């Protein structure tokens, strides 16, 4: 199911790129469109970034093998960010003025998305974020150059609450739900949505940040043992995930 979701995201992103290509006259002159690939093959999240980067390259190669988009072939170049916002902005600045124009940016990072979303309108650069990024950018009236696809972090957080609501037969009044989250722009994204849902549904929201990379969580799970929430939502990434599972087992 995960593979299908990724494949669908790639297909939609490529279709979106097709609508962002130059006019037919310009296409006739230039039968190539450049696509920057911001990747993180190194750094603490490399286990996530490497297959993602490989998959994007494979998909673009497949598109080209089938004739491109309306006959326009996709050229691409990787720029390593190591999931670092500063490096990501450097990649954006270097690639945005690539000769022939840039199709769109898929930053593969929430922090980088935050940083370049302010720059995108002035640069007339499109920011495509399949399933991640800046949740507020779903409002296209404000974020005209952001294209979130397949939902966002608020969508995911709301799905979690809906699932718990089903288990609790439609009422969360008086319940206590803990959010253990990666202390980064990515990890903080679901908080506004969960706070709204807590106010609406009448449950208490405990917010427990975990400092990156997430290998030290004993104090966090001590709070879980003390507070005894009814549910724990884990918003993790990289090495934080297996560490959380081990600590949860020790806490149970």
What are these regions (language model features)?
Residues 33-35, 177-178:
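Conserved hydrophobic helix-helix packing surfaces used for dimerization/oligomerization
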Residues 15-27:
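C-terminal segment of classical bacterial N-terminal signal peptides
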Residues 30, 54-76, 169-172, 199-202:
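Signal peptide-proximal N-terminal region
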Residues 86-90, 135-136, 144-251:
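Extracellular/periplasmic Venus flytrap/periplasmic-binding protein
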Residues 32-34, 47-54, 66-140, 149, ...:
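Beta-alpha junction/loop-to-helix N-cap segments that form part of ligand/metal-binding clefts
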Residues 39, 78-81, 179-182:
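Short glycine-centered, acidic/aromatic-flanked micro-motifs in structured strand/loop junctions
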Residues 1-13:
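Bacterial N-terminal signal peptides that target proteins for export
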Residues 36-44:
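Acidic/histidine-rich, surface-exposed loop or edge segments in extracytoplasmic proteins
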